[in-house]
A protein has these predicted regions:
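Sec-dependent N-terminal signal peptides
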Residues: 3-12
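Basic, often amphipathic N-terminal segments
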Residues: 17-107, 120-209, 213-230
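A generic membrane alpha-helix/interface feature
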Residues: 1-3, 86
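Conserved active-site/ligand-binding neighborhood in enzyme cores
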Residues: 110
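A short, structured beta-strand-centered segment in the mid-to-C-terminal lobe
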Residues: 115-119
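N-terminal targeting/docking segments
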Residues: 2, 15-18
Length: 230
């Protein structure tokens, strides 16, 4: 009996930890080849001036964030099912988006840059429908354990933790800024880049997925993917 009690307590503690586990997710749209080429071109430019930045690769997938939320890890399958219903009812591949400018989010002397698309009505409706669908499975916040981290960079920037916590409503609806992140560079360089004329172009989503977020808000680990072809 003396042996069983600690074992039961250990089992109970592990179960509670599993229940409390949280994942920081990004429900996103994967852009077509037109956007991919432009994003990769810009990423190469940024890496030349800031080699310590990141390349667009398997752990930094080019994408358009629709929503970012903290969800209970135990409910991930329910999140996928809820998102699938919304995506199946929307003609996502038929959405035509216009990329019209560069932008960046400043962080001290550097900035996280991207290509911005206009937030058209179809995209805003998709976002709102996804927010409603996954709300039953969300929690208010998380910590570094909710994200993909590396041994060299184990602590997530507190500003990112806060950003995901307040994505709804601070980055949704009228505040939605659909974009494809392209990399990191010194703010001085990015200011010059933004001052130059931007050649607008149109593109469409080619797919949708759920990713676990990493540092800089990157799509670091694919959790679920959908084929949206009609």
């Amino acid at each position: 009996m003396k042996i069983l009690v600690p074992l039961l307590l250990l089992s109970s503690t592990a179960g509670a930890a599993d229940t409390a586990a949280v994942t920081a997710i990004d429900i996103l749209l994967q852009p077509d080849s037109t956007m991919l080429l432009r994003a990769e071109d810009n990423n190469a430019r940024l890496l030349k001036v800031f080699p310590k930045g990141f390349a667009l690769d398997a752990t930094h997938r080019p994408h358009i964030t629709v929503i970012q939320r903290y969800v209970r890890t135990a409910d991930l399958d329910k999140v996928y099912a809820a998102a699938n219903k919304v995506l199946a009812a929307a003609n996502v591949n038929g959405i035509k988006l216009e990329a019209f400018k560069y932008y960046y989010i400043p962080s001290k002397d550097i900035g996280l840059a991207g290509i911005v698309a206009r937030p058209i009505a179809e995209l805003l409706k998709l976002q709102q429908d996804l927010i409603v669908a996954v709300t039953p499975f969300t929690v208010e916040t998380g910590d570094s354990s909710a994200f993909v981290t590396t041994p060299d960079d184990p602590v997530i920037d507190p500003s990112l933790i806060q950003y995901v916590s307040t994505f709804v409503p601070k980055a949704s609806g009228d505040n939605f800024n659909p974009h494809v992140t392209t990399g990191v560079a010194p703010r001085e360089y990015l200011d010059r880049m933004l001052a130059k004329p931007f050649e607008s172009f149109t593109f469409s989503p080619a797919g949708a997925a759920v990713y676990q977020l990493g540092q800089f808000g990157t799509a670091a680990k694919k959790l679920k993917e959908w084929d949206l072809k009609p």
